[in-house]
Regions:
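Active-site loop-to-helix "anion-binding N-cap" substructures in soluble metabolic enzymes
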Residues: 1-157, 161-242
Length: 242
């Protein structure tokens, strides 16, 4: 939860100008404001082919008596293209399960949105040597019911929870190891070609200082940016790090 309405629109306008001036046309930039500001932010960035807007979450039902919730259909009707699902904070604070996230993925796809599906492990799981199986299970239980056609519409974001706000940092070697493993696991279900074509983003405290090294990894296709996205100049530095 960051930015007031005025601050969010100002940030969107600044990012839009910087994307037009500095970011290569083949680099896709996505902003994910709070749902309250999506419509205005989307208007602010409209007309820029490589700048899009995402929601941070959606409900798994298309409509109904779920006070305070927002459906994928409602998000799509606002003109956006993406929705983040399964973010580590949603899993931690709202107890979102793999089963629930499978339903959210289905809802997003049915509404024509591209899901950015997040997965990742805690420090305990990493230190216990259970992290590979844990993250594989997240993918299997939330995505492997999809047809090959629908899977091709999904973006994956790996979040090493142990490297977010802990003072610890994942090395580029650790990031590459996990991304290669995730791609290999996806290939067991959908084949190597489909896995190779899947965008896998890195979301563990990626910032202006480490983005270039991380993005140089063979299996890191981009970043899911947190705090660094709140400052336009830092965000654009990351976007120009490819």
């Amino acid at each position: 939860m960051n930015k007031t309405a005025a601050e969010a629109i100002a940030l969107a306008n600044e990012v839009a100008q910087l994307v037009k001036a500095e970011v290569s046309a083949d680099v896709q930039v996505i902003m994910a404001p709070p749902s309250l500001f999506i419509y205005e932010v989307n208007k602010a960035v409209s007309g820029i082919s490589n700048l899009a807007v995402s929601a941070q979450n959606c409900h798994e039902k298309s409509s109904g008596a779920y006070t305070g919730e927002i459906s994928a259909n409602m998000l799509a009707s606002s003109g956006i293209s993406y929705v983040i699902l399964g973010h580590s904070e949603r899993r931690q604070y709202f107890a979102e399960s793999n089963t629930q996230l499978a339903a959210k993925v289905d809802a997003a796809l049915a509404a024509g949105l591209t899901p950015i599906f997040c997965c990742g492990e805690s420090l305990d799981l990493r230190e216990g040597g259970e992290f590979l199986a844990y993250v594989a299970q997240q993918l299997t239980e939330s995505l492997f019911h999809l047809s090959a056609e629908d899977f091709a519409k999904v973006v994956i974001a790996y979040e090493p929870i142990w490297a977010i706000g802990t003072g610890l940092t994942a090395s580029s070697d650790q990031a590459q190891e996990m991304h290669a493993y995730l791609r290999g696991h996806l290939a067991t279900k959908y084949g190597q070609n489909a896995a190779d074509n899947c965008s896998i983003l890195y979301g563990g405290s990626c910032n202006a200082k480490n983005a270039q090294e991380l993005f140089a990894c063979a299996d890191v296709d981009g970043g899911l940016i947190g705090g660094a996205s709140l400052v336009a100049a830092d965000f654009i530095t990351i976007a120009t790090s490819f």
